[in-house]
Amino acid sequence: MGSLNSIAVLGGGAWGTALAQTAARAGRKVTLWEHDAGNAEHLIAARESRFLPGVRLEPSIQVTRDLAEAARADALLLVVPAQVLRQVVTSLQPLIAPRTPLVACAKGIEHGTHRFMTEIIAEAAPAAIPAILSGPSFAADVARGLPTAVTIAATDAACAQALAQAMNSGSFRPYHSTDVRGVELGGATKNVLAIAAGIVEGRQLGASALAAMTTRGFVELVRFGKAYGARIETMHGLSGLGDLTMCCSTPQSRNFSFGMALGRGEGIESAAHGKLAEGYYTAPVLLEMAQAKGIDMPISTAVAAVLGGKLSVDAAIEGLLTRPLKAEE
C-alpha cells in the first residue's frame, strides 16, 4: 500500500477533533466531518471544538458536513459510537474507493450481533480494508500534543504500517499490528472493568482494593482474550494492559467516572451525566460472550448485574469478596 496523504475523520467530538489535530500535525491533508449542523457551524466559525475548549484547530483542517467529500480521502478514521458504526459505514459504502482503509476508533461490541468493530466494517463495506485504532489515550492529551502511544491494527500488514506512518507525529506514536481481534477485545473489555474500578474509588475502598480490582480485572481480560483468539503480547500491550491501567486510575475516563458516581450511590441516569459510558452497553454483551465459552469473569459479571438492576453495589462487592479461595493465575 502506498502512502496515505489525505485523512478524513468522521465525528467532530473531542476524540475526533483530537485525531484530526494529530493527522494535521503529521502533515496529512485532513477533512473533519461532523453530522450535527450546530457543531459543524461552531467548528467552522470558531475553529475550536465545544468539547475541547481552548484547543484551536490546525489551519489545514477542513470541516465539512458533506459525507461524499470526506469519503474521497485516502483513509477514514471512524470516530463514532460503537452502536452507530454500522449505520455510518453503510452510508459510506457506496462513496468510497475499493480498498480504502476504514479505521474504527470506538471501543465496544455491537448489541444483538456480538460483532466487533472491524467485523461490522467488513460486513457493511466489503470492499474496504477494516482497521482499528486503540490504546491509552485521552482526547484532551492528544489534542494538546502531549506524548501518546496507541496501536493501529489491520489484518493487512501493509495497511497497518501505512496507517501508523500516516498518523505518526512528534508526540503521537502509533505501533502497528495484525492482531485485530486482540486490539479490539482489549478496548471493549477494559470499558467494563473501568466501571468496576470507578465503583471501588467512589465507595472509598482504598488504594489496595483499587489495585486488586485492576489486577484481577486484567486476569479476566486475558481469559476472555485467549478464548477469542487474541495474542498474549497484544493483551500485555498498549491496547490491553496499557488502556486498562489508564482507565482504571483517573476520572478522565468516562467509564471510571461513571463507576465512581455509582459507587457514591447515584442512580444510573444521574451517574451518566447526560451520556452513558460505552461500558454500560458493552457489559451485557461481554457477559453473554463469556458465558457462551464458559469463561469465568466475576468482576465483569458483577458490573453487568449492577447495571442491570439485579445487584446493589454493596451486594456485588460482598459477592466478590466472599468467593471461594483459589490459587492465583
Curated annotation (Swiss-Prot):
The keyword DNA repair does not apply. It catalyses: sn-glycerol 3-phosphate + NAD(+) = dihydroxyacetone phosphate + NADH + H(+); sn-glycerol 3-phosphate + NADP(+) = dihydroxyacetone phosphate + NADPH + H(+). It comes from Rhodopseudomonas palustris (strain TIE-1). NADPH binds at residues 15, 35, 107, 139, 254, 276, 278. This is Glycerol-3-phosphate dehydrogenase [NAD(P)+]. It is found in: Cytoplasm. GO terms for cellular component: cytosol. Pathway: Membrane lipid metabolism; glycerophospholipid metabolism. GO terms for biological process: carbohydrate metabolic process; glycerol-3-phosphate biosynthetic process; glycerol-3-phosphate catabolic process; glycerophospholipid metabolic process; phospholipid biosynthetic process. Keywords: Cytoplasm, Lipid biosynthesis, Lipid metabolism, NAD, NADP, Nucleotide-binding, Oxidoreductase, Phospholipid biosynthesis, Phospholipid metabolism.
